Design a protein with these regions (language model features):
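Short loop/turn segments that flank or connect secondary-structure elements
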Residues: 1-167
Length: 167
């Protein structure tokens, strides 16, 4: 069995292709700090600005922030109750195996009787691993707030211009 950061990981199987990413249609994977080369404010800010990462939080005690893949159409800072992963494409995940969050790599396909995937890297464990970087995450929350990525801002301005032109 392969491991990443001491957690068992499972590459996508034919079973994943059959179900067309049901897990990805409901809950994007969470990133471990080990998924990033640069954990500084600027390094993580640059990754988040690409538009595929959200800052989420764990509500139970002790509380804490962590990073995960964004849902389609959601803000950068967003408490998740589920949604479609931005990385889900008709053929499966558009990220290479190396680019995927540990929360995705740790999913064992069809682990239980309901055919659901089960992960070896929980959100609670993820949140605990991000604790060391809580100051950086808090600065990112303050920076992004309800902001959109530069791409989303540009697209919004283009839509506004098209609406104005169509009047």
């Amino acid at each position: 069995m392969q491991t990443v950061a001491n957690y068992p990981v499972y590459e996508a199987t034919k079973e994943c292709a059959k179900c067309k990413g049901k897990c990805c249609q409901h809950m994007p994977g969470h990133y471990a700090p080990s998924d990033f080369k640069d954990l500084s404010f600027e390094g993580l800010k640059a990754e988040i600005e690409k538009g595929n990462i959200a800052i989420d939080w764990w509500e139970e005690q002790p509380k804490g922030y962590y990073l995960r893949a964004r849902h389609l159409g959601e803000e950068i800072v967003h408490g998740s109750w589920g949604g479609v992963c931005v990385n889900l494409a008709p053929w499966g995940c558009r990220l290479s195996w190396e680019e995927r969050p540990l929360g995705c790599k740790s999913l064992k396909p069809h682990e239980n009787s309901r055919g659901e995937c089960k992960g070896s890297y929980s959100k609670e464990t993820c949140k605990n691993e991000w604790k060391e970087y809580s100051e950086v995450l808090l600065k990112l929350v303050e920076h992004f707030g309800a902001k959109k990525t530069p791409f989303e801002e540009t697209m919004g301005k283009m839509v506004e211009a098209l609406e104005w032109l169509s009047r």
